């Protein structure tokens, strides 16, 4: 992340988000590994079409992938995101992933209403 500008990352995020391999689109997570228990992460989120403060599923998936690759410990990994710091622990049992624990602050960033007729169900 330190070697790329935000504009470069935004363009790459947009290109990957719309890549034909992902017909419904995808969130794109970028990360730098600072230590075995600390990473820095940015999420380019579909629908928002820009970076967001945080993405819990993206953060959990990123730490899980890095843990399985042996890049981070998977135990109380601190993840610095634009919205603050999240912590992730990968719970394993005999080589199987049992749980992904995500903790961190929460904030209401908007409120809205969805009418029944807008749901199309």
Indicate where each model-derived feature is located.
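An anionic, turn-rich surface loop/hairpin at beta-sheet edges
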Residues: 57-58
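Active-site proximal loop and beta-alpha junction motif in alpha/beta enzyme cores
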Residues: 1-54, 63-121
